[in-house]
């Protein structure tokens, strides 16, 4: 069975790129933080990728809600953001993100990061 991922980004082009790069996984998509949180609660994915700056709820707010719920707290979360200052990256990681990738990211870096996080969380990555 393919690992289930939730992808949340309000930029349609970024979502399309991520979906293309991670097409070997079972993907659910949200364009805002509120919907991302709903999907994470419904789907209980193996991994979530959240943009930091989204409407309705930021990625950090979604992260906080996920970590605050015992049912969703163990889900690995990769934050994606154009904000690449050291303080912002540290804030994301200290808030409970598993990883933090700065946009624009290299396609191979995203795929590698997802595979590593899934492997670390004891899910077998999908071979392409």
Region annotations inferred by a language model:
Residues 2-12, 18, 48:
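Conserved acidic segment of CheY-like receiver
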Residues 12-28:
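Two-component/phosphorelay signaling modules centered on CheY-like receiver
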Residues 29-47:
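Acidic, metal-coordinating helix/loop segments flanking the phosphotransfer/catalytic sites
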Residues 54:
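Receiver (REC) domain active-site loop signature in two-component systems and cognate sites
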Residues 105-114:
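C-terminal output helix
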